[in-house]
Amino acid sequence: MSRSCELTGKGVQSGNNVSHANNKTKRKFLPNLCNVTLISDALGQRFRLRVSAAALRSVEHRGGLDAFLLKADETELSMRARLLRRQIVKKAAEAA
């Protein structure tokens, strides 16, 4: 399991710890990942995803998983999230 968000693609970044004496040592900045269960209204199912805390706030802000995935750029999404997005688009097309 990689250390990256399935919805936003946010991942590990590298940088330096800088001491008071300006000594630099390498370090990693890890994303704040949470295992959450999100509900798709269009599909009527629950999905367990590993997302960052910032992505979770964005999902809530946009009005749920369906709205977030429909508005998201497909290149940033994981393969699993892309599949979910395609299923939601297909279901919406059938309903219309």
From Swiss-Prot:
Indicate whether Ribonucleoprotein appears among the record's keywords.
yes
Q: Where is the composition biased (Polar residues)?
A: 1-22
Mind telling me which GO cellular component terms the entry cites? Answer: cytosolic large ribosomal subunit
A molecular function (GO) held by this record is:
structural constituent of ribosome
One Pfam assignment: Ribosomal_L28
What stretches pass through the bilayer?
none
Chain positions covered by the region annotation Disordered? 1-24
Keywords, in A-Z order: Ribonucleoprotein, Ribosomal protein
Name the GO terms of the biological process aspect.
translation
The Swiss-Prot or TrEMBL record describes its family as follows:
Belongs to the bacterial ribosomal protein bL28 family.
What is the name of the protein in this document? Large ribosomal subunit protein bL28
Origin species, per record, is Sinorhizobium medicae (strain WSM419) (Ensifer medicae)
Recall the taxonomic lineage recorded for the source organism: Bacteria, Pseudomonadati, Pseudomonadota, Alphaproteobacteria, Hyphomicrobiales
Identify the coding gene.
Answer: rpmB
